[in-house]
Amino acid sequence: MAGRSTKKTAKTSTNKKSTKLAVKRRAAKLTLLAGGNPQIAKADGDAAVQAYIAAMPGWKREIGRRLDALIVRTVPGARKAVKWNSPLYGVEGQGESKGWFLSFHCFTKYVKVAFFRGASLRPVPPAKSKSKDTRYLDIHEDDQLDEAQLAAWVKQASLLPGERM
């Protein structure tokens, strides 16, 4: 009996170690919220946005990289932050920020790009919002991204008064 008890204790000890290790690994991984949107701590700067993009699941990560590169190319020196688990892009004004002009967010089947003053863009981005000013562009996995049109919207949006958040 003593031998059995020792084997069982050794086995239980091994299981506890494995469980603790698995819990630590899960805690180290990023959490994906509803629709696969990464949960990233609120922070200012490029590092937070890059952490968000790196945590975007599957094909959405490449969309995030392309969006970030296009925004930076179109609006050099754009201000970046992550708030409410979404990257935000803004422009510095005279002495203070003019506000945020764009954000994006992962959903189950698409990445939603939000133009906070989208109703003022020409042409107006296709998807409406509950907010009269905001318009969206939903990017699905197999969509052909019209980068010229997107860059035009980004440029226009960066010149408008931004959202204060």
Question: What are the roles of these predicted feature ranges?
Answer:
Residues 2-165:
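Charge-dense, helix-prone N-terminal extensions
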